[in-house]
């Protein structure tokens, strides 16, 4: 696998990753699937000339090897156009060989409910963390950003701590999201729902300079289209 993440304009760095991953999933108990994987990555990080001195220290080449575990408990009534039930997913990447020894955690929970006829309402939460087991600074590319779909109305990647003019992400993010469909307004349009939404999110933690941490809750409320 190969991937390029270009955040030079917004976050002051660019990452080129090459590597491979191998994994498998199996049903451990009813509705509970366990995934086990391993990935080995070679990464090159370059930083912008205007980046801070602490960011420039992270420029260079890296090799990382991780073992991943994924636990997925799925009680939805159906995978597509779900109307009831919930799913809960926890994943962790444990460093085996890594210069920064970064441990990644992610937990997602989402519940679906039909409050009235032809309505689908959801509530979800997300928590992610990226920290070093040995107290090192995690790489610029390992820092977390709030997904755009989790905080609508804000520019993607431009929320949270800043180092000079660069949005540098955080060691932790959390989000809460609620949506409810508005039936009958678009009932003649296929694969599109009109939804009301409320989002709240926080991003915090700057391990390489705690004076840059400005964690605060951002929120938005609105109406949008959901493409199925």
Predicted segments — roles?
Residues 1, 28, 78-80:
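Outer-membrane beta-barrel pore proteins
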Residues 199:
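Short basic (Lys/Arg) and small-residue
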Residues 5-14, 26-31, 47:
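C-terminal structured domain segments across diverse proteins
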Residues 2-6, 14-20, 40-44, 65, ...:
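Transmembrane beta-barrel architecture of outer-membrane proteins
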Residues 23:
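Phosphate-binding glycine-rich loops and their immediate beta-loop-alpha structural context
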Residues 46-191, 196, 204-206, 211:
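C-terminal outer-membrane beta-barrel translocator/porin domains of Gram-negative envelope proteins
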